[in-house]
């Protein structure tokens, strides 16, 4: 059987060790004779899953004690609404950094609840898209918070700086970059992330929120999106997505076994450098992102002859290189190389790219 490597942007590849363990435990979890999917979320057995997964996540990200960790429903799109409704308070304005598709999507949702001050930080130089340094961002004085997206999956644009905005409340959509490298949680008021890229399967959403920001929700906010309600109920205000939570917990343990986020950073940098090196080697492939803002997680690329895209994708699929088609908004190709993607998968892709260029270049 051909070795398959899944380059999907999300739901994305999971570590094979995690899948094997889940397979082994699927029908008889911890000797209970049932699956973890079938037990009560309030049982002592699942409470152990919840407690261990939070502890492991806190260890990985070095989350300070004055932050709550919430395991939620709804994906990042639910957080596009939850953030303003939890954080605006008496204000009607928030700063939104527009650096790409998902940042702009957050703006559109926020417009239902406030008047966002939208700050376009993109640059376009010699056909390459980049991001202004944070010190050039023109933040307003009275915004309730500053929202940005550190990694744009569609455009392959990353903001690698850590924010240093004084006392401003910083909110970040880390859906596609969480756990890929160490970050300083204390610089943020809220971090949220859909699980289906670098955490686990779809259905779970992670929120990390500083405690002093709780209790400010709009009165019309649905309870299921209220950070204080979720925190007071240990993320069990209603039945959580237990299987996704369990699998994410296994991923956290896998990350610790691999050496933590420092090791992930080294691996992810090596994978990205290998792939971008293959793209830049000749003019056959192109990436249109400024080098300083190239994503380690999502690598879009095009060919000089777009008519070859369909052939490239079909031949890649035949060789076990799956889900390389670019997003419908951007076209071309895109390789998502999250934590679970081994460097062997990236090497298989770059070898195929070189062979395809030799035959069609």
Swiss-Prot record:
PANTHER family: PHOSPHOSERINE AMINOTRANSFERASE. The gene is serC. Its EC number is 2.6.1.52. This is Phosphoserine aminotransferase. Belongs to the class-V pyridoxal-phosphate-dependent aminotransferase family. SerC subfamily. Disulfide bonds: none annotated. Pyridoxal 5'-phosphate binds at residues 76-77, 102, 153, 173, 196, 238-239. The keyword Transit peptide does not apply. Gene3D superfamilies: Aspartate Aminotransferase, domain 1 (3.90.1150.10), Type I PLP-dependent aspartate aminotransferase-like (Major domain) (3.40.640.10).
